[in-house]
């Protein structure tokens, strides 16, 4: 795996994608000392509280297109969970960068599926992923690719396909 996947220097096996994303986020928080994460609207990263936000959204309730609200994916999320998640619109490079800029001092990580599995395998644009890579690198924020589903896109996953290496990956 370390030879095939650009972002892998070390591997930790888990029993599920949920555990994999939980551990990458936990590691990002430990490394940066920050607590917030950013995720794209419509992205599915498992069923733990940190990512059970804005998975399936109702446009009438999810805020403005340029400032999506963090919406619970299910009842029972821990108190304060929604305050720890910055939701950015998928493939809206300028809008997403603005949202990230507003929160950069508090963000531990940006987690993204390079190809949104829960909406029918919708690929991110190279421009969008490049902006995320550049922004996170410039601001000391960990970029996490959740490739639990999208890894199948090529022998080295979407990160090989796009030529963009995240700081951490889940697959």
What are these regions (language model features)?
Residues 81-84, 139, 164:
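A short helix-to-beta-strand connector/capping loop
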Residues 163-171:
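Active-site PLP attachment segment
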Residues 2-106:
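PLP-dependent aspartate aminotransferase-fold enzymes
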Residues 107, 136, 143-144:
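Hydrophobic beta-strand scaffold residues
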Residues 113-126, 140-163:
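Conserved PLP phosphate-binding loop immediately N-terminal to the Schiff-base lysine helix
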Residues 10-14, 39, 112, 143-146, ...:
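General beta-strand structural signal in soluble alpha/beta enzymes
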Residues 1, 24, 37, 85, ...:
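Buried hydrophobic positions in well-ordered alpha/beta secondary-structure cores of metabolic enzymes
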Residues 92-99, 115-139:
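Active-site core of PLP-dependent enzymes with the aminotransferase class I/II
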